[in-house]
Amino acid sequence: MKILSIATTTSDLSVALNEADHLVREKIEENQRNHSVDLDPDIASLLAENGLSLKDIDRFAVAIGPGSYTGLRVGLTTAKMFASILNKELVGVSTLQALAQNFAGEDALIVAALDARNKNFFAGAYRGKEAVIADGHYHLSELLEQVGALPDQRVIFVGSDFSKYQEEIAAGLADKDLRLAEGEENLLHAGAIGRLAVSAPVLDPDQAVPNYLRRTQAEYDWAKKTGQEFEADSAYVEEV
């Protein structure tokens, strides 16, 4: 099964080609803010380098959130379009679960977190592929409390630059063997999305929506305008 994976939920842009759970080729552009401009050329280049076309792909996989609102929509819209037009499978993978795969070989609790400002994080904790703290929007103090309550001795934080919170994290998890990922260890890899996509449930392209984990201002405005309470699995993107 050939899987084309797309990661546009962070400032880095990544696309990958997997043969089942085997990585064939991956491209990553760090600190790339023009995802809407660069995504299609990167996909075309990746396919051309491997003598393939979009028609050869069996499954399209995309980081479905959380992350950058604009980036989420760019990646998901592209994957949905390919899957719909070519009548191929579409799957969505948690950004945080994919980040946790950077340390898949470690015997540790992996806390994947993206800075959401003001000491808030989009975060989840994983043992291998198993989520032990559900992906959510947490204040740092709440996240540390939940991690501290778990029995795992080794804990690795990945996904963001945690240096400015290092002292607070260390104090909150004083009884843990703590490591904070640095530099390229925090990159989101489309190849990891491809591996996770092998066992991910297939989505209906017409119903697939981003997993923001919190409302955007546009969603607040939409709820006010329509009088309908926004739900995380609602078809808000389709409604507006």
Q: What are the residue ranges of the model-derived segments?
A:
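N-terminal beta-alpha supersecondary unit
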Residues: 1-64
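Short beta-strand scaffold segments in enzyme catalytic cores
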Residues: 13-18, 121-125, 211
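Residues at secondary-structure transition points
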Residues: 30-38, 69, 73, 77, ...
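DPxDG-like acidic metal-binding loop motif
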Residues: 61-90, 95
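Acyltransferase
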Residues: 179-240
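Stable alpha-helical structural segments in soluble proteins, enriched in small hydrophobic residues
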Residues: 46-50, 85, 103, 190-201
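Surface "functional belts" at beta-alpha junctions
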Residues: 22, 34, 89-187, 229, ...
